[in-house]
Amino acid sequence: MRQAPVIHLRGLDSSIGHALVERIFRTDAHLVVPRKNYRDILQRYATELEFGECELHAADQLDFASGHRLMLIGLGPFDEPSDGENGFEVDGLEIILTAPAHLGIEVDTEWVDSLVLVHDLLPRVKDSTWGSSLFNQWMTQLNAHELPSLKGETKHWWVSDIDVADAFVRMLMSDEAFPGQLKVSGRRAWSQAQTIEELSLLHARTMAGRTGQFSVEHLTAAPTPSIEVKSLIVSPSTPMSREENSQQRPDLSPLHDVLFRIDGDGWRPLVPIRTALMHALVDYVQ
């Protein structure tokens, strides 16, 4: 009989951390969280815990053991007083570190089993670690009634934190080990101009909704932007200039392959970017 997996999460004070908790509560896993987050999660998800199959534990209630999985989210620190002298050095404990790619941090991967870099995430709350500084700049300009400005010619491969969390949980709930290195992003390239156009329209509609001052322009259906879909496999010619590299989408084939082995679906983000942009801007106009 299959045993419910034990998943330890550290670094939950982020949009992607919240999304992971929400998604795991739809499974039968044992979820282990830091003591400081335990009571808030217990209260916030009381209904899911009462009627669902997932069980919640604080870190000092369930120790690391062989076969458990530990996902570290963000930049840390990740240690808990209950970890003891050995910390994460437990035989058979799979350690996955996931970090925002845009920060360009160098990680010593000797102590982790997998390093996952997430590109162009659209978090549903303001997040200085995971959110794009360029997105933050655009929202600041829009709120000041200014036209968002372009910065270079970089493209973005936007992806919702909901889709990223879903992919992570599909892997965490499976018997498949996380690949040693993994990159996550959306599959479609968005130019800055396309993103600004879409974001400006959504911002205008949101502000009109708050004030009740709608115009025909706000209520007219916006055309769907022409977005290019790229192959999952990226095989760049070398050497590449910095500008060429900024146009190159992360190689998603390892992510797609492991998800395909798990359930046959592969990497197919379901949240439309227009919806993800709407989720992302809401916290800026509260």
PLM region spans:
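N-terminal Rossmann/SDR dinucleotide-binding element
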Residues: M1-S66
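NAD(P)-dependent short-chain dehydrogenase/reductase
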Residues: E106-L172, L199
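Short, well-ordered alpha-helices that flank and scaffold nucleotide-derived cofactor binding pockets
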Residues: H18, E22-R26, D166, R170-M173, ...
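Conserved Rossmann-fold NAD(P)-dependent oxidoreductase catalytic core, especially the SDR/UDP-sugar
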Residues: A59-D60, F64-V125
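Short, aromatic/basic amphipathic alpha-helical patches
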Residues: L20-E22, I41-L49, D83-E89, I105-E110, ...
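Amphipathic terminal alpha-helices
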Residues: R2-I7, V21-V33, S241-Q286
